[in-house]
Amino acid sequence: MKTFVKIMTLVVLLSLIVGCAPAPAATEAPVAATQAPVAVATEAPVVPAAPVLSEAEQWAKDNGVGPYQPATDDWAAIEAAAIQEGKITIYANSGGIEDLADAWKAKYPDIEWEGADTDGIDTKMAAEQESGNVVGDVWFNSDGHILFGRFVPNQWLWSFVPRDVVIPELTAERPFAVARHSTDVIGYNNKFYPNGCPVTNIWQLTEPVYKGKFFMEDPMSDVSTMAKIATFVQNADEMAQAYQALYGKAWDTDELAKTDASGIVVENAGYLWLKKLAYNGVVVLDDGDMVDAAFAGLELPEGEEPGFGWTGYSTYEATLDGELNMSPCFGMEPVMGIFKTSFLAIANKAPHPNAAKLFIRFALTEEGFDPWNEIGSYPAAEGLPVFEGNLPLAELLPQVWEMDPVFDWNNVSKVRDFWAASLLVAP
């Protein structure tokens, strides 16, 4: 009996143990098949939006000028459109433009001509652009510093160079057609000095012996002349070398190189030369004819030192005709003159854009260059004749400095202030 009880007790305990054990975890049935990958739609390549053109750029594009000029010029279509426009207006800073009128009228009788030597071209054209009342079609002007410094950034002028004309000096940065180069020189009176220019170094013009004997157009009233004298500042290193060669010492040892009580700071040898000119009684006059008469006129007193003048090389032609006694100071160190550039451009929103194209092409032909084919002027376009009496360019260029329109624009105001202050405090 006791044995039976023990057995039953053991059975009950085992039942309790089994009942308290956790049930085995259920396992999930294996997935029968994997899902197919979802296809992702690919986008079409993004096409860049066309650049938004300014109003001026749109006009240039519509009229095929500037960077929108076609690869070829359809001159038959251009001439037909120009005849429909019926007129051309040119603003030029040279009297030679008036000598071109007859040739134009003979070639294009159906296109009315309006072109004259115009003062203040930059002021006039800027006012037209700002007002929106554009009258002038063509800029024919040598004030390159204003062209590149003011008009180009404002999109007031556009380039146009006929595709059949080659002007080697053009670049992407300077794309405007070049009508010609001309030369300003330091001249002397060849009657008073029949054996040649009495000075060989430009610094001699600032010495007391020539006090009040250097004549030039007034830079304060002539923007072109102010840009020209900025060229001496740009080439200060060569001015310093010329000073050293003449005086045997550095330019900054000069008494006038020091900052004086007026506070004028002389930054380089170019500025020093301008200051010394002012202190030596430079004579500024209203125009080039007055300059020529002052030192090379036929009526100057006998035996009196006539001095020197900053004048056009073309003035020498008047000497050959017996009207003046001027010769350039060839061989002067470091230079005897300045090499200038006359640019052609089409006004933004010009009322006669096709006539303007026609004129630029005409101006770059032998017939169009003829009024300026004279001593001191050199064509820029290939194939045009050079005046027979001109000094060959290979001989001229080492004796002159070419004006840099970008430098001039960036520095002309500073040079103007320096020049004005020097004149003001000069004894």
Which residues are covered by each model-predicted region?
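Mature extracytoplasmic/periplasmic domains
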Residues: G337-V406
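Ser/Thr-rich, Proline-interspersed low-complexity disordered segments
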Residues: L13, G19-K61
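Periplasmic-binding protein-like
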Residues: I167-L170, H181-D184, W273-L277, G322-N348
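Bacterial N-terminal signal peptides that target proteins for export
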Residues: M1-M8
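Extracytoplasmic ligand-binding site segments that recognize negatively charged/polar headgroups
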Residues: T89-D102, E114-A126, V134-A296
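Short, polar/charged alpha-helical segment
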Residues: P51-E57, T72-I83, N93-D110, A318-T319, ...
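A ligand-binding cleft/hinge motif common to bilobed small-molecule-binding domains
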Residues: H145-R150, E304-S327
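Conserved C-terminal helix/tail region of periplasmic/extracytoplasmic solute-binding proteins
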Residues: P48-A71, Q399-P427
